[in-house]
Amino acid sequence: MGFLTDWLTDWLKGLLIEGIMGNLTGLFDTVNTRVGEIAVQVGTTPAAWKAGVFSLIRQLSETVILPIAGLVLTFVATYELIQLIIEKNNLHDLDYWIFFKWIFKTAAAILILSNTFNIVMAVFDVSQSVIASAAGIVQGSTDISSSMIDTLEASLETMSLGALLGLWLQSFLIHVTMWALNIVIFVIVYGRMIEIYLLTSLAPLPVATLSNRELGSMGQNYLKSLFAVGFQGMLILVCVAIYAVLIQGIATGGDPVGAIWGCVGYTVLLCFCLFKTGTIARSIFSAH
């Protein structure tokens, strides 16, 4: 009878350990996968991310928004000419060189407006180049090795049946929680790309105001916003890299319960930091 009890206990312990390791392996595999996915997503240019969406946004920008921006530029250029004329003592001290100055500024504004889409894409090409360079370093240093899982499994084999049952229930709950948090991370990363497309679609309107001293703040703030959203990807990559390194620490700590709850705690922290990356990027570039 004692032999049967011992066999049943060992069988249940093995079953629970297998279930716990299945949940934990899924969690740690998600870390590796998430690092790779985010590195790819934030390191992809708008043109390469979704070609169909990019083509639609470009067509809307060039066929719908650009003509309106042309009207805005006409107003800005006319306003600029009036300001240049009346600022010289109401035409009493009029210098004709100001007309050449106005022609040059207007020509430059037209050139910039007609190449708005190329300028916007150049901003994101610069930011994605920086992100791509950093992604290789991050991806190579944050992978979680299988030896960490083996160390964790060895510590589980020394635990009692009751402790393993409680730990299995906790691991299952945390597995579901991590799945939900991964959806949140997905929304944040993809939401950034949607924001890039939205900014790109209306690009000609603020760019049309750049040539004017008084109205140019709109265009300047728009360019700051472009750089902020572009380099937000770098901050997202840094957050995920820090997260993966922290996960490595708890995976080798030898405390299964602490490893599980530490994993979910760090994931909640990651989601919070990802939400803050947009605010931090805008504050760095002084974008409103």
Please name every model-derived segment:
Residues M1, L8, L12-N23, D95-I112, ...:
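Alpha-helical transmembrane segments and their helix-start/interface "positive-inside/aromatic belt" motifs
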Residues L60-I68, I103-A107, I183, V187, ...:
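Loop-to-transmembrane-helix entry motif
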Residues M1-V72:
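Binding/recognition "hotspot" determinant
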Residues L24, V31, T106-L202, I236, ...:
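Non-cytosolic segments of integral membrane proteins
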Residues V72-I110, L202-G216:
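Hydrophobic transmembrane alpha-helix segments characteristic of membrane transport
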